[in-house]
């Protein structure tokens, strides 16, 4: 059953899956790479269908999405964890 929110935020399930994954993995982004990729692909499809000027809460703006997709192609996939125990 889809709600009106799902129609305005078609990538909401993917965005929520990222939050769940991050919480389960102590916010280690590298453990959630595939799920993040799924969100970016959903957002890419959203913009292809609706135009780059449209917005949805769950997707980065079109220009930022383009940058993120390019970074992932270049292998710069995940944020790096900072070890706060090191001086």
From Swiss-Prot:
It holds the Pfam family CMC4. Keywords: Disulfide bond, Mitochondrion, Repeat. It comes from the Eukaryota. Disulfide bonds join 11-42, 21-32. Residues 8-50 form the CHCH domain. The keyword Zinc-finger does not apply. This is Cx9C motif-containing protein 4, mitochondrial.
